Amino acid sequence: MKRFLLLLILGGLFLGGFRPFAFSQGSMSIYMGQLSDQSEISLVTFAPGEELHAAFGHAVIWVRDPLQNIDKAYSYGTFDFKTENFYWKFLKGTLPYSISFNSMNDLVYYYSQIEHRSIKAQTLHLDPAQKNIIYQALEQNLLPENKNYRYQFFHDNCSTRLRDIIEKAVPNAFQWTKYKNLSGLSYRDWMNHYLATNSWVTLGMNLALGIPSNQKATASESCYLPDNLSEALEMAEVKGQKFADSPLLIYQAPEAEKAGFDGLGPIVVLQLLIALVMFCSIQFRNNPRFLFRMDVLLFGVWGLLAWFIFFLATGTDHQVMSWNPASLMLFPLNFPLVFWFARASKKVIWTHYLSVVCVLFLIGLVWSTLLFWPMALAGLPWGIRLFALRLKAS
């Protein structure tokens, strides 16, 4: 249950869709020789799945050499639940991630028969030297002293590592400035393309992300998503010739049923809560005891949420969570001050406090709305009471 709750809150952001385990630990079987002329190297892309951990897809580099009896699919983004202090390191952004490899048959079976996700492969057109550059880089990363790295959702994940390895072997393969369809959107925009708008996970992930996620991603940077890397590879050319074969469909997953509108999603629930708060504010305007209890609940819960977001922004190594305007909208200081509200309602300092918080709330609300509009709904329930208290204090 603890694992489920942690993944529900933060899993989409930290895991993306990137594989959280290895089917086998083959890192001891490292072959540092040269590939033969019959070897082939492919990028294999696994489509997004229905589960949270699979929301953004996955990608591996597949190296096969029948003469050397090599069949390895290299995957970045592997981690071990048995790591000491796993949950704390996971939350702090200090959990070590690593590279692993499996046979392609194992991967195809798992992703097709267990997770029911489509699979496509693109064979790269490489000369022998380029093949060995890629292969040696992967094998070097498997060494114990090299295999672990610090994962970053947007900048260092299973897809960006493969992009960098390919670029190192063939520097001019990608003409990034020509890929207009892969540029112009922010990291957050690309992420939200893969998520349902009316979803608690989507809302939570957007609340957790800070200003860095709104930076416009270049075509190269957009390849933090495996689908975008596959698309870039399809457009890549070397000396006027296609750098990779067109995607070969290895497995076509059955078309999933389109999910209907979720009546318990955040858009509906938060709108109902906003309406309820407005109704109670009017209906019980002459019942200070009831309103005080409602304020304690709203300001306390929203204040705790604000402290959690503030911790993610300032107390972790997740750079994409820094400078988060949601902290202004939800305002952490509400939690320690919540029990003071009613008793200070006649004091001048109370009026000044409410005025300052109202301004900060509006700044955070407008800012958050521009980033992802459902976030505004998350701030309004307590915001309505904030302005009601400010009017009462006038």
Language-model regions: role of each:
Residues 49-50, 117-125, 144-153:
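Second-shell loop/turn segments in exported
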Residues 25-30, 36-39:
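A eukaryotic "domain-start" boundary segment
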Residues 126-139:
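A structural motif
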Residues 7-17:
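Bacterial N-terminal signal peptides
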Residues 140-339, 345-349, 357-394:
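Activation targets extended, charge/polar-rich intrinsically disordered C-terminal tails
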Residues 18, 22-26:
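Boundary at the C-terminal end of the N-terminal hydrophobic targeting segment
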Residues 37-116:
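Glycine-rich catalytic cores of cysteine/serine-nucleophile enzymes that process amide/ester linkages
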Residues 1-4, 394:
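Positively charged n-region of N-terminal signal peptides that target proteins for export
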